[in-house]
Amino acid sequence: RTLDCSDIDHHLGKAITSSRIREPISNNDIRRWAHAMHYPNLLHYDPTYGEQSRYGKLVSMQSFPCAVDDGMGTSPACAGRIPNSHLLFGGEEWWFEDRRVSGGDWIFNERIPFDYVVKETKLAGPTCFQRGDNFYTNQHGQPLAKQRSTSIRYNAAAGGQNVDTSQFDEPEWSDDELEALEERKLGWIRMLRALGHDKRWWDDVKVGDQLPERVFGPHSVASFTTEWRSWLINT
């Protein structure tokens, strides 16, 4: 099998269109994102805590800018037609500026397809790994973050032949397993609350230290719904 990626070449290095937000960011937009990402930092949803911080107000998580994008940051990694193909999201890289978003701000995104490469995979033979960049700025033109997303594009028929149907069944969790999982989650939350407004420096962590793990899941209809509604394109 071959994979015709020639149409992608026409899009590389050229900005693609995007659907801009119609209203400024609100505090509840920021809260919904923190909720969806299971991130218990009071800085992103408690106004009193935010006022006591170095920011003096409630501010967003660093990853929040992608919540305003109508393609969730993936669009520049999907530009171009590959006939008879399917696509998987392959992850992303982030570069953050020391600048946060707060209520009243606007976020804009310039989306530019970056590059692609075709490699042989066990999944589907010739497989296209395509990357695209998102450049997020505020209403002052100041950069907020850069997000580089990767898509995995492959022949649909070839990929379907290699699907492992034994993994289709959903796992079942007992009450005891869920309770133990919640206790593991609380360990990280307690650490975050104990730190408060203090900073954790490099020297505060030593080789061999046992650090609390950040656990979230398992996903459910409720958790997926919470995440879906946090994207501004859905509100």
Predicted regions located by residue number:
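A structural microfeature
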Residues: 145-147, 212
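Short glycine/proline-enriched turn or capping motifs at secondary-structure junctions
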Residues: 84, 142-143
